[in-house]
Amino acid sequence: MIKAAATLKSLQYRQNSLTDCYGRLSFGPVNPGQGLTIGNTLRRILLNDLPGIGVIGAEINGVQSEFSTLPGIRESVIEIFLNLRELIFTPTATCAQKVKQTKPFVYAKLNSELKIDNFPYVVTAKDLHIPEYEFVDPNQQIATILSPTAAENFKLTLLIGQGRGYQSWKKLPGVPQLMDQRFFEQFDSTQTNSKSVTFPIDAIFMPIRQVNFTVQEHSVDGEYIYFEVWTNGSINPFDAVKSAAKVGMKLMTACLTTLQDQQVYLDESKLPETPNFVQVNYNKMESESNFDQIFIEQLELSLRAYNCLKRANILTLADLSQQSFRDLMKLRNFGQKSADEVRAALSTYGIELKED
């Protein structure tokens, strides 16, 4: 049994470019046989479960097909969309918490004050106006404008969201409903001679590009795990491994709470006075409920129910749990069918509507 506490250490850090970071880390000592289990778990979490930010929809002035070409623009529409998928974001320090709590999606538009004097002009990430996020690489290319007429007509609107891994837009919470509602702003008729179409984009949210690990035995200390982590620059490798460990702890704590629920037949007189590990973590999870981070888009409600709640500023599961049946029935266009949908959705999270 290893008595020394395991620690995470950064052994090497290298930034090859703004969007390519490399880190080598060690974790240990751990007991013989545990290195492979811990290393494989953290590797899978790093590749699959860390959140990221990406472009999930785009609208270009006058474009009705992704196979179109734009007069005076070097790239085709498909090439522009592929460039948009490569944009990497990080929340600004002042807006990170606000965006996390209240804005599952945000807009980005081409800066209206952008003045182009020389052609060809390369439109880059820094030409977009988006106060909620920062670009990891402000010089990431989007499109090339070849003429003043093209510069005047080129209008771009993006929808940016958060997620994990690679996700089709059809599976992103709330996005299909937003597309059905024509969520994007339509440009003024004086700015366009034809109708614009909103194009969903399958986003790549993964901040981790690659992870390797090896386990080495030390005759005295036990096993050490050595990680090699490559990221896209939105997070450094050391913080990425720490975040992965937190995700793993949260998952395991959920398993422990299930075990705690199964101990109802124990003789309470024989339980220790000091709360055990399971009880402490169960109480902690109850007090740190994340219902305020679950948005109503994730409940997969009908469009009518979703719109009614959105108009009433009921944005999260926490907001919804504070409503009673009578409160919901007072909402405009909210009927019995919508109420039944909400009840069913809440039941999947183990909560009910507030008592009248």
Curated annotation (Swiss-Prot):
GO terms of biological process kind: DNA-templated transcription
Protein name: DNA-directed RNA polymerase subunit alpha
Annotated GO CC locations: chloroplast; DNA-directed RNA polymerase complex; mitochondrion
One Pfam family, short name: RNA_pol_A_CTD
Residue numbers spanned by region Alpha N-terminal domain (alpha-NTD): 1-259
Keyword Plastid applies: yes
Entry-linked InterPro entries: DNA-dir_RNA_pol_insert, DNA-dir_RNA_pol_RpoA/D/Rpb3, DNA-dir_RpoA, RBP11-like, RNAP_asu_C, RNApol_insert_sf
KW Protease (keyword) present: no
UniProt subcellular location: Plastid, Chloroplast
